[in-house]
Amino acid sequence: MRVITGTARGRKLREPEGMASRPTTDNVKESMFNLIQFDIEGRRVLDLFAGTGQLGIEALSRGARSAVFVDESRAAVQLVRTNLAHCRLQGDVVQGEALGYLRTCGKFDLIFLDPPYDTGLLDKALANVVQFDILAEGGIIVCESRREKERPQLPQPYYL
């Protein structure tokens, strides 16, 4: 697992030891960032269910203005801090329950939602993003889930 491009290009990120996580593969991450590459610079990023922090770190490396990393696991939060320091990047790291964080945070231009599979957290997080109006106008939400999962329905003006 590495940073694909930007100021931290090529830096290897520490992976979890014994944590119940499945970091996004470099190939998937590269494809995802190729799709949004012109929508990153200067943006405010939220990496919810951060795990290793690799999605927010990739965004910072590519010029995002700021990033907030949220995870309830103490080990994950420490791993995000370690990876940020290793990449010489700065971000706000929050240890806490993701859905609770969404009730009190400000707006973001780019939101990464990569919760544990088969927990129902993706649908709940999307509902909270809509309910609490967290996505800035023109913003993007990137969700990761099983391929077989049916895409959630969102009210206007949101679309998938």
Protein language model regions, located:
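Class I S-adenosyl-L-methionine-dependent methyltransferase catalytic core
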Residues: 1-160
